[in-house]
């Protein structure tokens, strides 16, 4: 329950200050995968209607939530102004985590988790989209994302530009 409160507070903070990319459709109030698909479809139809070609690259970050750098995430928090209790709780949430596997009652030794957060966490997805938000700023082409699935879309305005556009993806 506590994790849900932190997740809600962090999400509200990020939405209020426009810290989440408009093209990230997952875990956002009033947005979903249908919005992502409709937006991509709209951009494709618009470019095709204008007689232009489009390139699409679709990415799925494998074990995305597991790969989030804890230190990097805490640096990100500080850079966007997250502090106080949310920073303190998030630091504790991400620190000193361990895991083990139990199969048929036999348990492995506990090992430290060095990146990511607990599986099935309510807070994990919000942390992931915040952590990856800068991806949308550095990509030259359009990026649309739903959680850890991303679509890069590039439009060829001039056929002579085709190799450069393809290379930019």
Language model regions located:
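RNase H catalytic domain
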Residues: 150-159
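Short, conserved phosphate/pyrophosphate- and ester-handling motifs at nucleotide-, phospho-/glycolipid
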Residues: 120, 124
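Polymerase palm active-site segment centered on the conserved acidic dipeptide of motif C
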Residues: 81-88, 145, 159-169
């Amino acid at each position: 329950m506590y994790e849900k409160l932190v997740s809600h507070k962090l999400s509200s903070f990020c939405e209020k200050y426009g810290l989440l990319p408009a093209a990230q459709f997952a875990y956002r109030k009033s947005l979903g995968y249908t919005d992502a698909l409709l937006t991509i479809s709209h951009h494709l139809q618009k470019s095709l209607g204008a007689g232009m070609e489009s390139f699409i690259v679709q990415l799925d970050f494998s074990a995305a939530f597991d790969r989030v750098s804890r230190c990097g995430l805490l640096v990100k928090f500080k850079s966007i102004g997250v502090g106080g209790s949310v920073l303190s709780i998030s630091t504790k949430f991400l620190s000193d985590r361990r895991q083990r596997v139990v199969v048929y009652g036999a348990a492995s030794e506990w090992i430290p988790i060095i990146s990511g957060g607990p599986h099935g966490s309510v807070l994990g997805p919000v942390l992931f989209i915040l952590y990856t938000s800068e991806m949308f700023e550095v990509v030259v082409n359009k990026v649309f994302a739903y959680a850890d699935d991303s679509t890069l879309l590039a439009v060829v305005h001039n056929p002579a530009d085709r190799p450069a556009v393809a290379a930019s993806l």
